[in-house]
Regions:
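Short beta-strands within extracellular/lumenal beta-sheet-rich domains
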Residues: 279-281, 339-367, 378, 403-407
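Extracellular carbohydrate-recognition regions
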Residues: 306-324, 441-480
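Non-catalytic C-terminal accessory modules of carbohydrate-active enzymes
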Residues: 56, 67-69, 75-168, 844-847, ...
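Short Pro-Gly-centered flexible turn/kink motifs
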Residues: 59, 190-192, 284-299, 479, ...
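Aromatic-rich carbohydrate-recognition surfaces in CAZymes
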Residues: 88-93, 97-101, 109-120, 184, ...
């Protein structure tokens, strides 16, 4: 009988950690070799920023030197928010005995940000610091060691926040902790004072209030208990609630004088604006003695104006008048004339709607020229010429914030009176319009920036108000959003659990020790592993995404996410299905949260026809269905339903989704494979933000996998699946016989003989053909943005998806392995010195190695292949690496992992922030699949079976299920499960054997 050892989290136990530091590899010429999952020192500290906070609750980062950065606690990213705050230690009787508890400031911080020529007077960079620092992470804990020849103390800083797989609520708390541990390294008794000092970085015009052991930073004009609390648990703490009030640098100068002279000040809170506050904790340290002071950070910001896709303010578009350009959370607006333009994004982004109608004017010139930008939704976001109550001309943007010139020929309307109506009737992405510089002229080539004397400027929007224009409100709300709880903007989950900031503090104080113990259980179990160090580093570093601003959790607990994070707003909204396909961490660590995504996709985002929006509204609500579905996202979602069902073991959950899953698959068949040949031939939108025309290996492999998943689910529920079995066979045949060239899978580009209209007529992101050269390219090569004969790194991703979801890969496995080896051979670069990239090169450039998205080893590269083809994406690197490992190519897979992690060495990129279209990009959580690839460990809760298919022989590794987590090991072909939290009910072990090791 197999022995199962279970440890409940409340039981005391000891782990023996076996953490490998692994091999070392050169990163860049002249740079020392990197050791994975190890300590960062020197220049490798430069860009480290380690997220601390709860899932969907906001975050701050602990930098490699010990400073705080990226303070983002008010429901949006604030990437460059480095608050004026610092911890310090003063040692009495020691020359130069006062130091900020940080290492030296990296020079990029001084000269890299904006206003770098102004001296950085709003930062703490000029204060004395420790000479030496080192950083090590064991997610979710980060540890910094500080040393200084002048300070007889060894200092250890530990930052963390709760992260407990299967306990999503306690992992979503708005708080974090930084612990400062001091050890007296001298032979003398040391009298010291620890201090924590901060301006009101929440609102410089706000108030500072008292809380036990510390202070609360409160926004102005807020009567409720909102804001951020900073406090210690030490009974000896004394607090100065109001720094010196003066001018210039008075406040911070006096504050430092008090810290460095050990002048403990205890000013009481005041009613007005307080510039800053300090906490002082005196300490006596005997020789060799160690003491720890913990700084607690708790916050409560229950409200936001964040919406995506929901019409929240009917008729409020345009009412704030002209705009001076780019509005908050808007991409850069360019190409307008003068100082102002009309921009319906003003006052609420895409959520506000309304119409604006001009006074009548007489048409007495041949042409009307103007500028337009914004969304490409002619029926909803448009400029219209109205004559006799009818719309005779219409123009819209092209899904761009760059204004472009338009011209209407008014020859047929001479002498008539007309009005201009500007409409914004969309609350969805690109649901805004921008216009400027309406000019009547007889000259078709009139220069809008300096109209001639014969031209008539109807409107240039340079006045402060919209004189001569009338606002019109729509007669009814634009969409039936399905919102029934009255919450029309993002409200974080924690605001439903806690009534105010004090309630957060109380809960944290009551549960802190238990939550630390449980979080340590996760850390210890994860790193108690014999897996390669580069793998542990890749997986654990990217778990930081779940603590970043990329992730939100709305008021009712449902999960919602961006693709990544821009500097001040999320990047690409709505739990995008074709990006989150790759992310394999959440479904194993927090399966209940992952299942809310399936429920949203199939029960909210999908209409009766089976069309599924690949982006989710915020708040979560019914969307419009006025753009393509995403083939890879929608088909991948079907496989994820299978995966999440097997992880949960919940048949009732599967039954509740099954009708929608069937409707979804039927839609995919009707829309992209209408003749049921087994491949996606009609144009299909995908993760590259374009449409592939004709059958391709990438999306058809998703189709094959989705059919496989649906057949398995149908048979389990005793549903008829004969049609889908036949189609599955045809799909397999198509992939292996028609889309495999003997070495790898490819695309058969097709744009004629389809049900779809011409590429010039269907909606698309940026694939317009309005210029002659684009039309000529269409005639000679076909649609832009295809990959054709290319060797696509994602070219067989549907089979990777099948494997990580627990499905068999139905394709010829020699073909699959051949494709993956071709990707390794052709697409992997040891450096980028001779690689050109006109797209987004910062992901990998110069001395960086990486895996290109696509190459054309057999020639016939399109003139304009898909738009990101020359880039390197970490999420795809990990996908390919794990799939190679599954096929026995362990060293090839690990080489890709190492090249990827070498780029994130701390010198030039943050090791805990892998970027793609934004920071903390979700696709990078494909790294979690490498754990499964190496070990073949998968727990099936439906059959209570633990599967093992090791590619590396004996091992010990982490495992997380729907009900608990621990470690699993294989030794001499015998499995042993150690459950350290919750429980894992195993009735059977199934160990597969292979010849790959």
């Amino acid at each position: 009988m197999l022995k199962i050892i279970k440890y409940l989290y409340s039981i005391t136990f000891v782990f023996i950690l076996t953490i490998q530091s692994g091999p070392t590899y050169a990163i860049h010429p002249g740079w020392e070799e990197k050791e994975y999952n190890d300590v960062y020192t020197g220049e490798a500290l430069n860009y480290i920023a380690f997220p601390i906070g709860g899932m969907g609750a906001g975050m701050f980062c602990l930098d490699g030197t010990g400073s705080i950065s990226h303070l983002s606690v008010q429901n949006h990213p604030d990437f460059h928010n480095t608050p004026y705050t610092y911890a310090a230690i003063h040692v009495k009787g020691v020359k130069h005995g006062t130091k900020v508890l940080e290492g030296q400031v990296p020079f990029w911080k001084v000269f890299g940000p904006t206003q770098s020529g102004m001296g950085q007077g709003d930062k703490t960079y000029g204060l004395p610091r420790f000479q030496h620092a080192s950083f090590q992470a064991k997610f979710p804990f980060s540890t910094i060691q500080l040393k200084d020849n002048e300070i007889p103390l060894a200092v250890k800083i530990t930052g963390w926040s709760p992260f407990i797989p299967t306990d999503e609520d306690n992992s979503s708390l708005p708080l974090g902790l930084i612990e400062y541990q001091f050890t007296n390294t001298s032979t003398n008794i040391l009298e010291t004072t620890f201090s924590y000092n901060a301006k009101n970085f929440i609102d410089s015009k706000g108030n500072i209030k008292a809380t036990k052991g510390g202070f609360k930073l409160v926004p102005r004009d807020i009567n409720e208990d909102h804001g951020m609390a900073i406090y210690v648990d030490d009974a000896n703490a004394q607090v100065d609630y109001c720094w010196f009030r003066g001018d210039w640098f008075d406040a911070q100068s006096i504050a430092w004088d008090r810290v460095s002279s050990d002048h403990i000040t205890t000013n009481m809170p005041i009613e007005g604006v307080s510039p800053g506050a300090s906490i002082f904790v005196p300490m006596t340290l005997q020789p060799g003695e160690t003491k720890t002071i913990s700084i607690n950070f708790c916050w409560f910001f229950p409200n936001s104006n964040l919406t995506r896709g929901v019409a929240t303010v009917t008729g409020e578009a345009f009412v704030k008048g002209p705009s001076q350009g780019t509005e908050p959370y808007q991409n850069d607006v360019t190409g307008f004339m003068g100082r102002q333009l009309l921009n319906s994004f003003r006052g609420g982004g895409d959520a506000v709607v309304g119409e604006l109608v001009s006074d009548e004017f007489k048409i007495n010139r041949r042409f009307l020229k103007f500028l337009v930008g914004g969304g490409n939704q002619p029926e909803k976001t448009s400029v219209n010429l109205i004559i006799d109550g009818k719309t005779v001309e219409t123009a819209a943007g092209i899904n761009s914030e760059a204004m472009s010139e338009r011209i209407w020929d008014l020859q047929a309307y001479q002498g008539k009176t007309a009005k201009i109506k500007i409409s914004d009737l969309s609350a969805y992405p690109w649901g805004h319009i921008m216009v400027d510089q309406f000019v009547l002229t007889d000259n078709k080539d009139e220069n809008l920036s300096s109209p001639s004397s014969q031209a008539l400027v109807l409107e240039d929007f340079e006045k402060p108000t919209l004189e001569g224009w009338t606002f019109q409100k729509p007669n009814k709300p634009i969409e039936d959003s399905g919102i029934t709880d009255g919450i029309y903007a993002y409200r974080p989950w924690y605001a439903s659990k806690f009534k105010d900031l004090q309630a957060v503090i109380h809960y944290w104080n009551q549960h802190k020790e238990q939550l630390r113990t449980s979080t340590e259980l996760f850390r210890d179990a994860f790193f108690d592993s014999t897996l390669p160090a580069e793998v542990l580093e890749a997986i654990s570093s990217n778990l930081s995404i779940l603590k970043s601003t990329t992730v939100l959790r709305q008021h009712d607990g449902r999960f919602w996410a961006w693709e990544g994070s821009e500097d001040e707003i999320g990047s690409c909204h709505g739990s995008c299905t074709h990006v989150w396909n790759y992310a394999q961490a959440l479904p194993h660590l927090f399966p209940a949260m992952e299942r809310t995504m399936r429920e949203t996709e199939f029960l909210i985002n999908q209409n009766a026809e089976g069309h599924q929006n690949f982006r989710t509204n915020m708040p979560i609500s019914r969307p419009s269905h006025d753009f393509h579905a995403a083939a890879d996202g929608q088909l991948g979602g079907i496989m994820k339903v299978y995966r999440d069902w097997r992880i949960s073991g919940n048949d009732e959950w599967l039954k509740s989704l099954y009708p929608a899953v069937k409707a979804s698959l039927d839609y995919c068949i009707r829309t992209w494979d209408p003749h049921e040949k087994g491949s996606l031939t009609e144009p299909h939108h995908n993760t590259y933000d374009i449409e592939f025309w004709g059958a391709d290996g990438m999306c058809t492999s998703f189709y094959t996998g989705a059919l496989e998943a649906f057949v398995h689910m149908s048979e389990h529920l005793n549903k008829q699946a004969g049609k889908y079995k036949k189609l599955l066979k045809r799909s397999i045949s198509c992939m292996d016989k028609e889309l495999f060239n003997g070495e790898y899978y490819f695309q058969k580009t097709q744009w004629t003989g389809l049900k779809a209209k011409s590429p010039t007529e269907i909606p698309s992101f940026g694939s317009n053909y309005r210029h002659a050269e684009a039309q000529e390219l269409l005639k000679t090569e076909g649609p832009k943005y295809q990959y054709g004969t290319g060797c696509l790194s994602d070219g067989i991703i549907g089979m990777w998806m099948a494997s990580v979801c627990g499905l068999p890969e139905p394709l010829d496995q020699t073909h699959v392995k051949s494709h993956l080896n071709a990707v390794y051979q052709y697409n992997l670069r040891k450096n980028m010195y001779n690689h050109y990239n006109t797209q987004r090169p910062s992901y990998a450039m110069g001395g960086d190695g990486g895996l290109l998205l696509c190459t054309w080893p057999k020639g016939a590269k399109p003139t304009l292949p898909f738009v990101y083809s020359n880039e390197v994406w970490t999420g795809i690197e990990y996908q390919v690496a794990s799939h190679l490992i599954m096929k026995g190519e362990v060293e090839k897979g690990l080489e890709i992992v190492r090249l990827c992690r070498n780029r994130y060495d701390g010198r030039h990129r943050n090791p805990f922030d892998e970027i793609e279209c934004g920071h903390w990009y979700a696709r990078a959580m494909s790294s979690y699949s490498i754990l499964q690839a190496l070990t073949g460990v998968r727990y099936d809760a439906v059959t209570k079976t633990m599967y093992i298919n090791s590619q590396i022989g004996d091992f010990k590794s982490f495992i997380s299920t729907d009900t608990g987590f621990g470690t699993i090991e294989l030794k001499n072909n015998q499995p042993l499960l150690h459950v350290v939290y919750g429980q894992i009910d195993v009735k059977k072990y199934q160990i597969e054997h292979n010849n790959n090791h």
